Amino acid sequence: MTEAQRHQILLEMLAQLGFVTVEKVVERLGISPATARRDINKLDESGKLKKVRNGAEAITQQRPRWTPMNLHQAQNHDEKVRIAKAASQLVNTGESVVINCGSTAFLLGREMCGKPVQIITNYLPLANYLIDQEHDSVIIMGGQYNKSQSITLSPQGSENSLYAGHWMFTSGKGLTAEGLYKTDMLTAMAEQKMLSVVGKLVVLVDSSKIGERAGMLFSRADQIDMLITGKNANPEILQQLEAQGVSILRV
């Protein structure tokens, strides 16, 4: 057995066990204790394992920074990035924003991370990211954890109405001249309670959702202050929304 073969087997043992003794290496490879120690020393020097007393440990790989999904594979990713960047530029220093769940919401939170603004969210993937990145001001809305959406939902009539931000950014499954539609009723109802206390409601949807009607009506068009969407959005729907006082930004 060559040295390279021994090293490969030793590393495979560590991958399975996490720790091996010199005695175990000798037994498995049929080599002398001196050869086993020499192999461990070489692999330690090359950074492939950690040498410890009477054996070796597997090196714990640093966990990659977590994101809720492979964002680059999200539908209409590039358009959503442009939408998030445009939305982040609306917020001034010292203001507070409410950001809800979804891929666009996460992209927006990532854009705003590190800026001198307060971010209020019930979306745990975003909250975890902001905390990991040491964003100065993060408020996590409390409640029962909803596994399917990775959010917290508080009981009806609870303190969520106290989370009044200058801005509320939200998305949905469809937007028509009637308003914004969401398919998850629990999350929609939880967010609806904040509509009366936020300063401005900004809807972030990619162009594929313009003209779509799915689920429940979350907010009427006349409740929406601004829509940020893609350049391919249905112009007829956009005109109807503008006629109802919605500011339109296409990116």
From Swiss-Prot:
Which Cys pairs does UniProt list as disulfide-bonded?
none
Q: Which UniProt keyword terms apply here? A: Cytoplasm, DNA-binding, Repressor, Transcription, Transcription regulation
Q: What does this protein do?
A: Represses ulaG and the ulaABCDEF operon.
The cellular location(s) given in this protein's UniProt record come to: Cytoplasm
Q: Which InterPro entries match?
A: Carb_Metab_HTH_regulators, DeoR-like_C, DeoR_HTH, NagB/RpiA_transferase-like, Tscrpt_reg_HTH_DeoR_CS, Tscrpt_reg_HTH_UlaR, WH-like_DNA-bd_sf, WH_DNA-bd_sf
* NCBIfam families xref list: PRK13509.1
* Entry annotated with the keyword DNA-binding: yes
Broad class of where this protein is predominantly found? cytoplasm
Gene Ontology biological process: negative regulation of DNA-templated transcription
Give the matching HAMAP family: HTH_type_UlaR
Name of protein:
HTH-type transcriptional regulator UlaR
Please list the GO terms describing molecular function.
Answer: DNA binding; DNA-binding transcription factor activity
PROSITE patterns the UniProt entry points to:
HTH_DEOR_1 (PS00894), HTH_DEOR_2 (PS51000)
Instruction: Tell me which residues form the DNA-binding region.
Output: 20-39
Q: Which residues form the HTH deoR-type domain?
A: 3-58
- Record's GO cellular component, any one? cytoplasm
